[in-house]
């Protein structure tokens, strides 16, 4: 079933656990080749133009063999112009220390492939946001992680040392003392905000 949907430019990016990521035209305006000179290029917008909220049209998909696809965020690399969907796992928050963020290269929408993953070994992933070529990752027990995702994205991003910042939001006066439980994050006016289910809004 559907767990989460992100809609931008009339395209719905649906996260469906084991069914993975689906890209659906729900009212997108078709772009043509000439738009490449004016916009970073989303290949699904080149395929769009037939769907509507009452008549959605599926344009692409990629299954999740692990069965834990929780959230999907479209990302056009500022440095390589490749089109990715970053698919986040969820394995159970307080009860699980697993999951990561999978970089699905949809530059060729008919032949998507997973090229990279960012996974903190000791923590479980939840929501995420992309700002420019930077990933903001909510990592339950692992706090907030800020990751450089510029350039070529291949292999184990965590092992490559791309993490550029980390914030541990544990608090001795929290709902569960001295334990972060970061749920979601987003940037706004030069700051990063995130919610922690044990320790409030930061």
Where are these regions (language model features)?
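Feature marking well-ordered beta-strand scaffolds used for ligand recognition
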Residues: 1-202
